[in-house]
Amino acid sequence: MSGFTFKQFHINQDSCAMKVGTDGILLGAWADVKHCKNILDMGSGTGLLTLMLAQRTEENCQIQAVELDPIAAKQAQENINNSVWKNRIQLTQADIQHFLQTTEQTFDLIVANPPYFEQGIACKNEERELARYTKQSHLNWLEWAATRLSENGKISFVLPYDAGKTLTKSTALFCIKQTNVITKIGKTPQRMLLTFAKQPEVLMQDQLVIYDADNQYTEAFIELTKDFYLKF
């Protein structure tokens, strides 16, 4: 599959190591974009999250995407250029830690679908290994993001369930929203959608089930993603 068409944009992905997946779509639809004027997408890959957030935000919202892999960055730029939001999106090909250390911009929302497979069996190509395997911990990513977060800003990640539990116990930031993602009703959670902030708030916890017992999409999943998927 070389491309993925959504209701308002198209993602070409033939040059990218990691393709469009449910995790990214969930995060792009779930993250709270209210009152956001500046958004950062850490590790933008194909540009999926960047374009989803552009679709959901007002014209005065600027989005900064950062991608380390030059091949993925080039394709993300093409996807951005083909969208109606290209004038308010800036893409930088850089190491995310270096970018955060050198930018003076602060952000109201920072999102990431970070690498989360531990290094083990080698991938067939270097780009896919870079996209899939993390040499830094998720706590590193969260701490780096916090350095450029506005005072009332939010950081939203999607992670494997166990990794999400570990992260919430490891950070000094406040977890203010947690959605446990269950692939099929009756199963245990597989993923966790998390939002962190500098200021304490009452933690909002819920769950999202993707498929019901008949292997049909649940109403909750359809409601969350209907502005993007052509099939809904």
From Swiss-Prot:
InterPro entries: DNA_methylase_N6_adenine_CS, rRNA_Ade_Mease_Trfase_CS, SAM-dependent_MTases_sf, Small_mtfrase_dom, tRNA_Adenine-N(6)_MTase, tRNA_adenine-N6_MeTrfase
Principal location: cytoplasm
BP term (GO), one: tRNA processing
Subcellular locations according to the entry: Cytoplasm
Alphabetized UniProt keyword annotations: Cytoplasm, Methyltransferase, S-adenosyl-L-methionine, Transferase, tRNA processing
A molecular function GO annotation: rRNA (adenine-N6,N6-)-dimethyltransferase activity
GO cellular component: cytoplasm
Reaction equations catalysed: adenosine(37) in tRNA1(Val) + S-adenosyl-L-methionine = N(6)-methyladenosine(37) in tRNA1(Val) + S-adenosyl-L-homocysteine + H(+)
Superkingdom to which the source organism belongs: Bacteria
EC number(s) on file: 2.1.1.223
PANTHER family on file: TRNA1(VAL) (ADENINE(37)-N6)-METHYLTRANSFERASE
Function: Specifically methylates the adenine in position 37 of tRNA(1)(Val) (anticodon cmo5UAC).
Family from the record: Belongs to the methyltransferase superfamily. tRNA (adenine-N(6)-)-methyltransferase family.
Protein name: tRNA1(Val) (adenine(37)-N6)-methyltransferase
Originating species: Haemophilus influenzae (strain 86-028NP)
